[in-house]
């Protein structure tokens, strides 16, 4: 499990707790801040999941990963020349 995945889950849980406290004390700003932390945590976890997937792919198929990288580089360089 990547560091980003762990951080994302922790931030998500902290956001859920903060939202719950905001609802409990009837503080909409605190609740909204908790919702934002929860969303940020989910994004961070998804980023970590993506890193894990890409890392696994590169380890399993290094030549395919190299070919994909070369193709993307070629396309980007062609687009930037215009």
Swiss-Prot record:
It holds the Pfam family CsbD. It comes from the Bacteria. InterPro entries: CsbD, YjbJ_sf. Belongs to the UPF0337 (CsbD) family. This is UPF0337 protein PP_2059. The lineage of its organism: Bacteria, Pseudomonadati, Pseudomonadota, Gammaproteobacteria, Pseudomonadales.
